[in-house]
Amino acid sequence: MKKTIIKTVIITLVSIIIAASLAVGITLAVSPKTIGKVFTKCGNYDTAAKLYESQYKKTESVSDLIELVSMSIAADNDEMIAKYGDKLTVNYKGNMILMTSDEEQFDNYSKATVVAYYKLGKKEDCVRVAFLSSGAYTEGNSLYYLFRLCDNKEDKDLAEEIYKYDKKNSNAIVEGKSEMQKKVKAYKEKYGF
């Protein structure tokens, strides 16, 4: 009698473990972001970001890309912020603004991408994203932030990248362009390039 009860309990526990493992496995295969939400609530942002990355690779939808960039920022994963923030802010700019109807949020993603590239030492990409994701040199956007970053760090290399990008590309900056040009000229005079 005891052996039958113990055997039944063991079979039941093994069955529950197998069923739970199958449920998690199927959910991971079908919708990684569902499991990512669990890791987010637990505070494990790195794992959640990787799961959101899997979700984005499956769907390539802008909404999944937004969630991936947000989670990468929460995880402070500069490589993922740079890679996917670039896609979001440069390639999907119109879609992003339309989807969120919040240009300030878009600017936050752009600034995070600029900072990530800067931390990774990819200053040319840092400058490119700032220029391409901004239509103006106005306080609060990534282009303005780039110049502030350059000033605060007194980064000659970054200033030179800004100068080269501005001279090489006929950018679409209209609003605040004269103020921006003064800053570029000041960098040229200060650092002598």
Task: For each feature predicted by the language model, list its residue ranges.
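Structural motif corresponding to the intra-repeat A-B loop/turn of tetratricopeptide repeats
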Residues: 42, 75, 120, 152-153
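Alpha-helical repeat scaffolds
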Residues: 49-53, 78-95, 122-134, 155-170
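Structural register within alpha-helical repeat arrays
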Residues: 35, 48, 68, 113, ...
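Terminal, low-structured helical/coil segments at or just beyond the last alpha-helical repeat
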Residues: 157-193
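Residue-level signature for tetratricopeptide repeat
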Residues: 38, 71, 116, 148-149
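Hydrophobic membrane-insertion alpha-helices, especially the h-region
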Residues: 10-26
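Alpha-helical segment of the N-proximal tetratricopeptide repeat
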Residues: 30-58, 67
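Flexible helix-coil transition and linker loops at the boundaries of alpha-helical arrays
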Residues: 54-58, 90-106, 172
